[in-house]
Amino acid sequence: IKLDIRDENNVAAAMAQAAEHFGGIDILINNASAISLTGTEDTPMKRFDLMMDVNTRGTFACTQAALPYLKKADNPHVLMLSPPLNMHAKWFKNHTAYTMAKYGMSMCVLGFAEEFKPLGIAVNSLWPRTVIGTAALAMFSGLVKVENCRTPDIVAEAACALLVKDSKGCTGNFFSDEELLREKGIHDFDKYAVDSTKPLQVDLFLD
């Protein structure tokens, strides 16, 4: 599906297309993000708008458009790939705009979880304990090397573990990938490391 989540009409059409193809929508994963780890003077308003439009507004738009379909699902889940709301100033000072945009997604978790609770729709957050080796590493300006990361597999498996939970009994949580996998009895995470001989880089927003 071709989708620009900044365009609410495009989003609505994509949801309708997905629902028609699959016979409904059981799960919405809000993963699309724009990132720029830049200070105030180095963040053009165009870049600020992009991060807000994709991260916060896009999450709201996709959830709003998916809601009619999620209401009909047997075990509906909305999952945000967003961090816990860590209000320590150090997570704002070097990239206030990005933190605002990303925390907007996390604020949606809090609001949607309470709003949709009577509907039985779960809304939770998932955030990796370590930096994940994806194309987004380029935005870290060389501060993080891929060998100090884990692979996306750990996030995918954690998401699967979460999305099979009873939606009526698990909502409004901010989970880490390690936490969800430990619940499944997985305690050895070396297999997820890009290079298990190298130290891992803890992800943003985690102390």
What positions do the PLM features span?
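Catalytic loop of short-chain dehydrogenase/reductase
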Residues: 71-72, 76-118, 130-131
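The beta1-alpha1 cofactor-binding region of Rossmann-like NAD(H)/NADP(H)-dependent oxidoreductases
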Residues: 2-13, 45
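C-terminal helical subdomain
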Residues: 125-126, 144-207
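Conserved Rossmann-fold SDR core element
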Residues: 24, 106-110, 116-128, 168-175
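Substrate-binding pocket helix/loop in short-chain dehydrogenase/reductase
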Residues: 39-49
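A short, exposed helix-loop element centered on a Lys and neighboring polar residues
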Residues: 63-64, 110
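Structural signature of the Rossmann-like NAD(P)-dependent dehydrogenase/reductase core
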Residues: 30-33, 76-83, 122-127, 171
